[in-house]
Amino acid sequence: MGRWMRWLLIGAVSLWCLPGIARAESEVDVLLNMLVENGTLTPVQAGQVRRQISETKEARNKQLAKEIVPDSARNWKWKGDVRLRDEFRDRQGTGNDTHRQRIRFQFGAEGKVAEDLKATFRIATGSTTDPVSTNQNLDTFFGKKALVLDLANLEYTPEVPGISKVSLIGGIMENPLWTTDPMVWDGDLSWDGAAVKVSQEMGPTTLFANSGVFSLDTDETEPAALWVTQLGASVKPFADSESEVLKNFKLTGALAYHDYMNVTTSAKAGTDPITREADNTAGATDFNQFNPTVELASQLGQIPFSFFGDWVHNTSAPSTGNDGYALGIKVGKATVPWSLTKGWEAGYMFERLERDAAFDEFVDSDFGGGGTNRRGNVVWLNLAVLKNSTLGAKLFFRQDLIDNFGSGASLAEKFREDRLQMDWVTKF
């Protein structure tokens, strides 16, 4: 290639990459094809020029993005989801069977506002009177749906010598405790208060501690509050193994203590068993709960699986009606559409939660309408059908442990609810 032609091409490439004077790729291709046809360039040289143009344009676009978008905006990560749900509930003993459609919308962001400081917020559908649901029913003659502040917090993560990670969180936050299931804490519950999270890596073992204090009700003479503390560890003892199952084997366990203070004046205890606040006895004077949790996880054929167990014991309740436990298994993770190894998730859980084992306003609201005094099974299946989009079905089979209607019914005759939820979830 002649020197004059090299300079001509360099000039053309530079001109083509300038903002406001860009040329269509087809025009560049025509020019390069002409130079190949008249022998000025070989096909290999033309390909090199095309790659150079592409790389130069990409680098220039990245530089322009940095110049146009301020640093503060680039530090923010936006995310959200929409969930459409069709739900059927078959209730035996009440006659109140229902078939309804529901929607959930969540949108928020988290961003780095200083070297060790992160801010997070999220708005969601829901209600200011229901702490364990972000659903809205589609049954109000096209009425508008309410949006509420679901999360808003600051997280400070200072560098502490000798400790892998320390986080101080204040505001409205997600559950600061490590959990495997929603028996004690519903997944939609947002926590108002302050928390400290500490973790320390020690070879294949990671030790962690979580603690916090949360305000429940400040309008009473003696304000209601919740203190929580959790100590735990996770270990991967066979990280160097050639076996896929052993290499990915991970054992995690934790013991938590939950101390509710002055909740008897605020709790909606002993109310209608069909409502969300269903089943704590009116005589329950306190909730001091020990909550050990364990999970064994691994992977086989690129398919993750785990076994988990959860137990809760309220030391402040009478000697009966103060225990609960859940056992379950999860297989797969629905992330890649229609993939045999990464396109599905299935699971099963058995749960038994006695009347005063847990504070009934915060337990899983989907399992029989929420509340305690229940036992039953949960089965689910999720399929990744599109990028960032899943279809799922979940079945709940729940019945009372103690007859709430005072009829002395046998276990087979007590209140039962079978629930089917079919969800379409899209994340963005």
Language-model features: locations:
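N-terminal secretory signal peptides that target proteins for export/translocation
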Residues: 1-5
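N-terminal periplasmic/intermembrane-space "pro-region" immediately following the signal or transit peptide
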Residues: 7, 11, 15-94, 428
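Short loop/turn motifs that connect adjacent beta-strands in outer-membrane beta-barrel proteins
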Residues: 66-78, 113-116, 159-166, 201-210, ...
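Transmembrane beta-barrel architecture of outer-membrane proteins
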Residues: 77-83, 100-104, 146-151, 191-193, ...
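Transmembrane beta-strands of outer-membrane beta-barrel pores
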Residues: 84-90, 115, 123-129, 172-176, ...
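Surface-exposed loop and membrane-interface regions of Gram-negative outer-membrane beta-barrel proteins
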Residues: 85-104, 109-163, 177-186, 309, ...
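Outer-membrane beta-barrel pore domains
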Residues: 89-97, 137-144, 167, 245-250, ...
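Surface-exposed coil loops of outer-membrane beta-barrel proteins
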Residues: 128-244, 256, 261-284, 357-370
